[in-house]
Amino acid sequence: MSSIKVECVLRENYRCGESPVWEEASQSLLFVDIPSKIICRWDTVSNQVQRVAVDAPVSSVALRQLGGYVATIGTKFCALNWENQSVFVLAMVDEDKKNNRFNDGKVDPAGRYFAGTMAEETAPAVLERHQGSLYSLFPDHSVKKYFDQVDISNGLDWSLDHKIFYYIDSLSYTVDAFDYDLQTGQISNRRIVYKMEKDEQIPDGMCIDAEGKLWVACYNGGRVIRLDPETGKRLQTVKLPVDKTTSCCFGGKDYSEMYVTCARDGLNAEGLLRQPDAGNIFKITGLGVKGIAPYSYAG
């Protein structure tokens, strides 16, 4: 077993870092700070961070085949031109729910942008229940709604054979799976593949590795866990020196490094003293497994 190393690599004290995604072309890590309404791109070669400020909470960012990026801002699917910092609205959802916003999002293997919504929180993980829905933005900019009654739409990814969609609604305290039709984007046959243990707390962001195992960031649990979705067993736990771990992705030259985002919002003064790196970006090396490259939105 290789020796696992957890290091803080970017000290910016984000309020709620989320949605890390690796951009191979620029050797950069993209991520968002939801309540600060900023999308960040950290160049790991130059160690420079660029930011684009937007006009509403921004909950996820993804690569786009045409260049630039896509992001979920408020309740809008948007395209983002990084060079001139312009944002173009592609579609809107939940127009009847003024208190809603998007949360986590990710692009599927066919280039659709999946993202779900939730009610705006009154405190971290405190909100009006069952207000969210799961959507996807197709390459033609049409939107499909899959289901509603969601609490906090969160981590999502697809199996390596593209036949299973994995999904987290945080307050269910489970990781779920659906049968997935890559051609149509349809999902069906929802079932639970993992139930969180008490000390693992709230399941948040998620990514898959090159062996088909899932990695879940545990909000308030201060860890990422590796799961086998076929057996429902936890295979590994990697603890971090912060409680509010929010999401994870693989990156680096060969996708052998894991990047983890976290939050500081919700910590009191004592918590911030105890966790000076809350809100920073972490890198985990030595996991002995690689990730896969992220997919890009095809529209």
From Swiss-Prot:
SUPFAM superfamilies named among the record's database cross-references: Calcium-dependent phosphotriesterase (SSF63829)
Pathway linked to the protein: Cofactor biosynthesis; L-ascorbate biosynthesis via UDP-alpha-D-glucuronate pathway; L-ascorbate from UDP-alpha-D-glucuronate: step 3/4
GO BP annotations listed: intracellular calcium ion homeostasis; L-ascorbic acid biosynthetic process; positive regulation of ATP-dependent activity; regulation of calcium-mediated signaling
Keyword match rRNA-binding: no
First-level EC class: hydrolase
Tissue expr: Mainly present in the liver. Weak expression was found in the brain, lung and kidney.
Localization per record: Cytoplasm
Binding partners and assembly: Monomer.
Family assignment from sequence similarity: Belongs to the SMP-30/CGR1 family.
Protein name from the UniProt record: Regucalcin
Organism: Mus musculus
